[in-house]
Structures are given as structure tokens and as C-alpha cells.
Amino acid sequence: MKLSLVAAMLLLLSAARAEEEDKKEDVGTVVGIDLGTTYSCVGVFKNGRVEIIANDQGNRITPSYVAFTPEGERLIGDAAKNQLTSNPENTVFDAKRLIGRTWNDPSVQQDIKFLPFKVVEKKTKPYIQVDIGGGQTKTFAPEEISAMVLTKMKETAEAYLGKKVTHAVVTVPAYFNDAQRQATKDAGTIAGLNVMRIINEPTAAAIAYGLDKREGEKNILVFDLGGGTFDVSLLTIDNGVFEVVATNGDTHLGGEDFDQRVMEHFIKLYKKKTGKDVRKDNRAVQKLRREVEKAKRALSSQHQARIEIESFYEGEDFSETLTRAKFEELNMDLFRSTMKPVQKVLEDSDLKKSDIDEIVLVGGSTRIPKIQQLVKEFFNGKEPSRGINPDEAVAYGAAVQAGVLSGDQDTGDLVLLDVCPLTLGIETVGGVMTKLIPRNTVVPTKKSQIFSTASDNQPTVTIKVYEGERPLTKDNHLLGTFDLTGIPPAPRGVPQIEVTFEIDVNGILRVTAEDKGTGNKNKITITNDQNRLTPEEIERMVNDAEKFAEEDKKLKERIDTRNELESYAYSLKNQIGDKEKLGGKLSSEDKETMEKAVEEKIEWLESHQDADIEDFKAKKKELEEIVQPIISKLYGSAGPPPTGEEDTAEKDEL
């Protein structure tokens, strides 16, 4: 099981340092990526400091959105989010709420009611079905959508660094289970990234916060409430050693749930006032989603916000006011529910509220005044720290960790000790969960225990590995099963079977069972096979991703050649019509020939927007063959003829 885990025990020994130096050549610059439910962010450790990298739109955070336009173009990030209301069925977001989950997971079933795109069941998992243009339908695994977002972050970093990026540290919510972590790693592979570490978001935020606070031991509570997930972690920082003491949370609570409550309120209100049910109109719902999110943000700094939507539904406008008080009332139960994990984390770490030295707020939703107030009241009036940008903290910490892994000396002796978020154990007689590694155990770790057979002459034992806190395995989550065979005949209770659980630095669990009498061994690496993509599927998705990149490139080339022909034709049209330029110098016969040729090409363009590159090139050549002899005749040898391109060279069409 892939546990909450970060980079443990790095740069402690000179040997480790030398080894890191050796690795440095292979990995190049390692980037840190915060792959968020609603927004993602990328950073790099460079020249002794972290740079959060802005995307091609100049924004330091990028929407985790992917869209497919009717023309067959794929958009990622801001461009995808900006056209959500006009193309809701083919604009995919919230992939992180589906990744690593099964189709019948209650949260998946709840989510698909509200998602504008189609989610279908495939191999017991949720897949996303969209029209990718030209009437073609395609299904994508959530990993593939996340991979597209990761590709965008990778390209953002490459544009800034001016070189290829192949290795990354990617963050996940601390409460993500094994399947969700593995699926995130698979998304990295599909995007062409070697994910060197999966680290927990609150741990990353604590690194960002604690990097410059190296004196003495501090207890830090990280409260991370983002667009789709909620995490609380308690860490101690002691001279650059970060230890996660306890972690808790809800992988399905965030800003989008607050938006949803407000949307439901307005949909009901609209129905009450007009008798019309807006839910039937996907576009109207997405328009409302966009405006509600804007209003929510505005309410962090003002007490009321107006929501105005022109031609909202059946041509009618929508105009309502949302007050901060109403927003809080609609979400109060959700806001209050964030305090339970805080209480649990304190109990798990045997600390009192007064033992907390710093409270760090992370994630855009912590800008909500009511959330800040509840946290402050819970800690008896203690003010949370403000010196950290809640949107960028996680990527910042991931970038520091990436710096450590690429052997950057400026990171100092940074050590991260993380914990596993859930208890691990095996099933014993009667369906009992026998715990081997309790939750909040620092990893990496290794534990062994001796078991025996339940019946006489039993030749095989089945080892079933579970994660969870309940006393019976039926209430916990099965991670994997394997058999140890060839046990010699013996009365029950005589054979000695040693079961060992070992968690490595990435939180991957390996379980071994050994018959002490015969030395016969079997082992399993928990990779959640029933939930994971197979290597073949990953390979296919990598190829698909490359195909998409290739298609994006071809599409751009096609648009460029179309624009060249269009610019050439219109430039000629303008020059022929201008008496000061060509128009005044041509004979009426030549003018008519050129006008006819130009009009013909413009008409052809209008009816052949989707022609291929060769057609556009051929049509341009045809036009040149008619125009150039006329212009050459006109100018004789008085210098290069105006090809009509002089005004358009080096400029992209808008």
C-alpha cells in the first residue's frame, strides 16, 4: 500500500550525498508539481531558491481542465476552463475526484450526478467519455486526463528552464489510499515523467513553511483545504528534520462542494420563482457554476456579491445576490466538519491545543473567513500563520524536495519522516483484522509476526492484506491476496509462518510470508492490481498521449498553412483595391484576372475550412502562379515583387 510518504532520510550521510551526486547527471532538473483537483502548480529549485513558474497565460496556477473542441483541438488549462460554458459535455475537470477509485465508490456515484461530462463504467472503474471532434467518441481513464494536466505543467517548466524535464516530485492528499497514489504515479508515467517521489500535500506545505525556521523544535498543524480535498497533518520540525506525527482528513471535501451547495440553493430558488428546472440545461448549470465560484471568491473580501447571468435559461436573465451570511449558512455543516480531523490529529499525537506552535493554512478554500474563524476559535484565539501563499505552498515544498532529489546542495540537510495514514494488517480466523503496522507509524518501516495454520494438514495458507481501522476485515479495504503453498502435513497450530510487512520510502508495501520449517517463501508487492492500470494499458496510454501531442502539432501546422493562404489572399485583395498600391498600376485585364483568382481562393477557403495542409499549400501555389507573372511584368526587374506577404510576415493571426 502506498502510504503517506515522503523522502525519508536524505542527505544524511556523505555516502548518500555522493550517490545523489552520481544521480544528478541522470535526472536533470527535477520539478515539483502540485496536481490539484481544481488547479495545479509547478515549481523548481534553482540558484538556491524556489521559483513558482507562470504558464503561457502568465498565471502561476493552471486550471486542472482538459477540453476537446468540435474542431478536434485539445485544450488544457486556462483555455479549457474558459470555454466550459459553451462546451460543457467535452470539458473535463475533477479527474482527481475519480482517480484510483472504483465505479461503485459512493463518492463517485455522487459526483457523476453533477459532472457535465459523461462518466461510464469500464473494468469496474470510472472512465470519462467525450467527443474528441469530427463525431469521434473516446473514453479516457482519469489517469489519462491527469496526465494531460501533468504534461501541461511539464511544458510550462520546460519553457521556463529552456530544456527537457523528465523527473518530478508530485504531491497527493495525505489521506489518499494506495490505489489513488499508484494511479497518480501512473498518470506521471503517461505524461512522460519519472515520478521520483509522491509526497503528501501538507508535508510539502510544512517544508515551504519551515524551511527558514530551523531553530528549536516546533509543532506545526497544517490545515489544507483545497478545491476537492481536505487534509490535516501534525508535524514536528527540529533543525531541518520534518516528522509527520499524525494525519487525517477527507479526500472528498473542498471548495467545489461549497460551490455545489450554493448552486443547488439558486437552482431551487429559480424553480420556485419561475417554475423552470435549470438542471435540464447543462450550459446553464455550467454558467451558474462559473458565476457562483466568482461570487464565493468575492465574499472572502466583501459581504455580498451579485450573480448576473445574461440569457441564463430559455433566453431569460438571472440576477440574484449572495451574502456572506447566506453562503456560510448553506455550508455551515461542511465548515464545521473540518474541525473533526483537527481534533483527531491532536488525539493521535497526544498533544493539547496549547502545544501547537504554528497553524499553517494551505489551499484556496482557507481564504474563506468563516474557516479562518473556526480554526482560530478551535485553538482558543491563536492566529494562523500568514506568511505563505495558500495556492503555491504545496508546489513550493514539492520543489524543495525535488531540489533534494536532484542533489542540490543549497537545500541543506532536509530530512522528511512521513507516516502511513491507515493501519495495515492481515485477515486471521473469523475475519478478524490482525494489525501489523498501526496507522501513523513513521515510514520506511518493517514489522514481522508469526502465524500458524487453522486446520490439521493444511497445505496452503492464504494471506489477505488489508488497510483500515475497523476490527473486522469486511469493513476494511482489501489491498491484495497471495498463497503460501507446500506446507508439510502437520497438526493445526504447529507450522510457523512468518509474515513480514515492509514499507519503502515511497510508501509501497511489500508483504512476505515464509514457512520457517521449510524456508519456502512467497511475497506480494501491493499495487492494487484490481484497481490499477496494467502495464499494457499504461503503455497504450503513453502512446495515445504521444499521438495527441502529434495531432496537436499537425493541427497547428494545418491552421498555420490555412492562415498563410488566407493572409496572402486578403493582402492581395486589399492591394488590388487600393489605387495607391497595386490597384492603380494594373491593366484592367490583369486586375480582373487577379481579382477573379483571389475571390476564387477566398470562396474556396470559406467552404474548405477543414482541408488538409497539402490542399492549402497547393491553393496558395496556384494563386502565386497566377499573380507573380503579372507582378513581375509590372515591376520588370526593379527589385523583388511584392508577394502580398510583406505585411503579414512574422505575425500570427489573432
Curated annotation (Swiss-Prot):
It holds the Pfam family HSP70. GO terms for molecular function: ATP binding; ATP hydrolysis activity; ATP-dependent protein folding chaperone; cadherin binding; calcium ion binding; enzyme binding; heat shock protein binding; misfolded protein binding. Residues 420-500 are annotated as: Substrate-binding (SBD). Induction: By endoplasmic reticulum stress. Induced in nasal epithelial cells by high free iron levels. Induced in nasal epithelial cells in high glucose. Induced in nasal epithelial cells by 3-hydroxybutyric acid (BHB). It comes from the Eukaryota. Residues 644-654 have a biased composition (Acidic residues). The modification Phosphoserine is found at residue 86. The modification 3'-nitrotyrosine is found at residue 160. Its main location: endoplasmic reticulum. Its EC number is 3.6.4.10. Residues 1-80 are annotated as: Required for interaction with ELAPOR1. PROSITE patterns: ER_TARGET, HSP70_1, HSP70_2, HSP70_3. ATP binds at residues 36-39, 96, 227-229, 293-300, 364-367. PANTHER family: HEAT SHOCK PROTEIN 70KDA. Endoplasmic reticulum chaperone that plays a key role in protein folding and quality control in the endoplasmic reticulum lumen. Involved in the correct folding of proteins and degradation of misfolded proteins via its interaction with DNAJC10/ERdj5, probably to facilitate the release of DNAJC10/ERdj5 from its substrate. Acts as a key repressor of the EIF2AK3/PERK and ERN1/IRE1-mediated unfolded protein response (UPR). The interdomain linker regulates the chaperone activity by mediating the formation of homooligomers. Homooligomers are formed by engagement of the interdomain linker of one HSPA5/BiP molecule as a typical substrate of an adjacent HSPA5/BiP molecule. HSPA5/BiP oligomerization inactivates participating HSPA5/BiP protomers. HSPA5/BiP oligomers probably act as reservoirs to store HSPA5/BiP molecules when they are not needed by the cell. When the levels of unfolded proteins rise, cells can rapidly break up these oligomers to make active monomers. This is Endoplasmic reticulum chaperone BiP.
